[in-house]
Amino acid sequence: MADSKMLVPELNDAETMGAETSRFEELLLQASKELQQAQTSRPESTQIQPQPGFCIKTNSAEGKVFINICHSPSIPPPADLTEDELLQMLEEDQAGFRIPMSLGEPHAELDAKGQGCTAYDVAVNSDFFRRMQNSDFLRELVITIAREGLEDKYGLQLNPEWRILKNRPFLGSISQQNIRSQQRPRIQELGNLHTPSSPRPEAGPEKPHLSLWLEAPDLLLAEIDLPKLDGALGLSLEVGENRLVMGGPQQLYHLDTYIPLRINCDESKAAFHQKRKQLMVAMPLLSVPS
């Protein structure tokens, strides 16, 4: 999940602790003000037209099932990990790696023999799809996750055996899909970006201490203690309507927590405070708690 593009240029070394704190306070004020514009600042969903990739054939108790593995540049990519890094992550924490994908609605089609069947369209990021085409491991991983996702979403029980159709990139027609317009909050650096390499933990990622409080009726604040880090480089953060997920570089930290409030994830902001070694997150609320 780590994404260095989430970082912004550091502040000048001459800035003091008070200036850093003031910067974060301004950040929180800005997050609170932007709550008023949340409903008009960005559409809740975006319509995409997935491009064909390849098609796999399997079956369920109801008959033949075809899954069109498609791609779109509008789908966010997963973490840019090597296969060795991914294998190690999956061995240590299977929930620590996610492949963003859009699962389309079932549509009735006819197979090559003119018999009725059901097809599903599953879209992943286009750049990741091209990488997957050159890796049997990634391709099988995507197919496994796509099958499990369809089973969970639609209550299916698919045959674990499947095969990729030759010379047929898709079955039927690929429909447009609506994906949620959600952006990860950028992690701002409060201090310099010098980050010495951190040792890889031997016992898996550590769950950091989290503090939550309401700064205002419409603003929830979070402080995540990260004493092993000196900067935001390698940190990733995902905020959903009632969930906060954070990953640390080299699997030093992992946090996945439920928040019983409706969060405006599109307007959430984050900053790493170097002197305190804390990740601070400002989360405007969609509905004010009573």
From Swiss-Prot:
Is the keyword Repressor assigned to this protein?
Answer: no
Major localisation: nucleus
Q: Where is this region: Disordered?
A: 34-53
Q: Which UniProt keywords apply?
A: Nucleus, Phosphoprotein, Transcription, Transcription regulation
Record's compositionally biased regions (Polar residues): 34-50
Name positions with the PTM Phosphoserine: 173
Q: Which domain of life is it from?
A: Eukaryota
Instruction: Provide GO CC annotations from the record.
Output: cytoplasm; nucleus; R2TP complex; ribonucleoprotein complex
Reply yes or no: does the keyword Transcription regulation apply: yes
Residue(s) at site: Interacts with TELO2? 57, 64, 113
Its GO biological process annotations read: box C/D snoRNP assembly; rRNA processing
**Compartments where located:** Nucleus
Family recorded in the similarity comment: Belongs to the PIH1 family.
Q: What does this protein do?
A: Involved in the assembly of C/D box small nucleolar ribonucleoprotein (snoRNP) particles. Recruits the SWI/SNF complex to the core promoter of rRNA genes and enhances pre-rRNA transcription. Mediates interaction of TELO2 with the R2TP complex which is necessary for the stability of MTOR and SMG1. Positively regulates the assembly and activity of the mTORC1 complex.
Q: How does it assemble?
A: Component of the R2TP complex composed at least of RUVBL1, RUVBL2, RPAP3 and PIHD1. Component of the PAQosome complex which is responsible for the biogenesis of several protein complexes and which consists of R2TP complex members RUVBL1, RUVBL2, RPAP3 and PIH1D1, URI complex members PFDN2, PFDN6, PDRG1, UXT and URI1 as well as ASDURF, POLR2E and DNAAF10/WDR92. Interacts with phosphorylated TELO2 and mediates interaction of TELO2 with the R2TP complex. Interacts with phosphorylated ECD, EFTUD2/SNRP116, RPB1 and UBR5 and with RPB1 in a phosphorylation-independent manner.
Return the protein name.
PIH1 domain-containing protein 1
In which organism is this protein found? Bos taurus (Bovine)
Q: What is the lineage of its organism?
A: Eukaryota, Metazoa, Chordata, Craniata, Vertebrata
- Its gene name is PIH1D1
